[in-house]
Curated annotation (Swiss-Prot):
Tissues of expression: Cerebral peptide 1 is expressed in the cerebral, pedal and buccal ganglia and B1 and B2 neurons. APGW-amide is expressed in buccal ganglia and several neurons.
General function of this protein: May function as a peptide transmitter.
Protein's cellular compartments: Secreted
Organism lineage: Eukaryota, Metazoa, Spiralia, Lophotrochozoa, Mollusca
Propeptide: 21-43, 53-77, 109-122, 167-191
Organism: Aplysia californica
GO (cellular component) term, any one: extracellular region
Keyword Membrane in record: no
Signal peptide: 1-20
Designated name of the protein: Cerebral peptide 1
Tagged with keyword Disulfide bond: yes
Description of how the protein assembles with itself and partners: Homodimer; disulfide-linked.
Amino acid sequence: MLLAKISVVVLLLAIDGTSSSESTDNVVLSSSPDSQKAATSRHKRAPGWGKRSSLNDEDLFADSDSAQELLDSVAALKRAPGWGKRFSGLMSEGSSLEAKRAPGWGKRGQEIDVDEDGSEQEKRAPGWGKRAPGWGKRAPGWGKRAPGWGKRAPGWGKRAPGWGKRSGGDYCETLEKMVDAYIYKAVEVDSRRLADCGSGEGTNEPFRK
């Protein structure tokens, strides 16, 4: 029984010794230059990644005797011409920071008047706001009606000569014809009465003449 316990302890010590030796070998391998190169190769980025320029600070500031040379060296680090800049060209002595636009851009006039009280007035271009000569004038005779407009043609409203007038002879003849027609009608009616009713007494025969 005691022998079995001793053999188990020896076996555990042997296993512990082999594991510690493997860990030390791993540490040695990881500290070697070859292992470091293998580790860094797995995390390599594209060439030039994270670099702002191809020049080092030592190359940039070495042998720079003047500010102009420093500016020239900075110019080598810039991006494509005009990239992200509102004006072309680098800032140098006497250069303007204001972006240059086309001449007269955004200006309504060419000059500005300064009054005695110090207020400024914009001068507009000559003739600005003036309408062309004759603007708003209507053509000569506009709104006038043609001569004789509204007048009726000569003789309008006149009836033919003798219209509505009756001649004396025709009128009298017409009346005579009407009387004859009434008399004829009366005689015809009276003869029918005599035939149907006979001659009665007390009639107004004397008036029938």
